[in-house]
Amino acid sequence: MFAILAISSAADLAAQTPSVPSIKALHEYADKNGVSPKDYIFKLFEKSDIVVLGERDHRDSIQYNFILDLLADSRFAERVGHVYTEVGGINLTEEVNRLLNATSTTESDFMDSLYAYYRKGECFYPLWEKYNRIKFLKGLYKINKKSSRKIHLGLTDLNFSWDSIHTVDDYKAFWKSLNKTNRDSLLCANFASMYERQLPLKGTRKALVITSQPHAISYSGYFKPWKRDYGTQGWWMKKTFGEDRVKIVVLNWFDYNLFNGQNCPMTGNGVWDAAFERMACRPFGIDLQDNPYGATNYKGDAGGGPTFIKGMKWQDVADGLIYDAPLYDHVAAIGINGIISKEFEPEIRRRTELFWRTAHPKDTIVPFDACIEEYNVPITAPATFKSKEEIKRLIQAVEAQQKAVEETIANLQNAP
């Protein structure tokens, strides 16, 4: 009788979180099958033409250490040669490449040119204040300057210019169009229009597409508020070019859309990050199909907010996973030192007012000074909204809890 109860108790413990794999299973799989993140990406390019990389929070600057390291690898220029980003209107593609390929300029002159370009506005907000964009453009310029093979940058976002926006009504008209437009499908269409004009390298066209994770995943479904189907950029990419030609890879993050201002909803209730700790945080890349990582529930949205995805696993929305840095090392960085010059301030005030009157029509006061400070003053903070020590304690608690369950199950199963 005791043996029956013991087995029953062990089964109950094991079934407490049926959708969450064990730390042990995750660790063993990644330790055995994981390869270096760069090698993983280049391995995908051997069989596929397009790799969509789902980045974390746009503010996270740490992820661009890996991205720039990938682009700096000589294999990228030789075998791929083209990188595309969600950030940046397609209409600025030629101009940004002239900037990145300037050869007879000092670093000081380049930074002046970079700031002049950036002030034009790469997107439909008054200014893109995320520091990692400057980090990326500056890094790509340095890579191109050192190499005879230049990497071409394609900008895939909507065609937009602040020069064509003169009144609140102008901006409202554009803003309303965003809700009527499947931006994800346009991100794909803009990419496709540039991709088909690429010069093949060794007979094939290859491309790395960097876009935020909610856009990168592959998902389509009916979105009630818009009364129509909605497909993510990743879904459109696979539909346009085919499953085998497109591979979607996500960077490790947390279940950001479950964040309530206080918690830190780690993926798989924290077991992914605990497994990474067992590996001494050794970076790795793995496929997601038919393994404990892929079998973990996906708890995110599609397209940056239109709809929350239910009943799907990670292997249903992405092909691969890269762990490049532990969660507690992710850093959010906003503000670009000196971007708001005295000469540029009237223009940024104009844009800010148009934006605020459109996005916050009930507000009677436009917070000009606060906005300018956000654009102009560099600030860094943990991307998880919690300190490094707090995140480590949360991961340690997950480890301790699962060890206790494993020990209890083992003791019950070994009981006479």
Stretch-by-stretch model annotation:
Residues M1-S9:
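Bacterial N-terminal signal peptides
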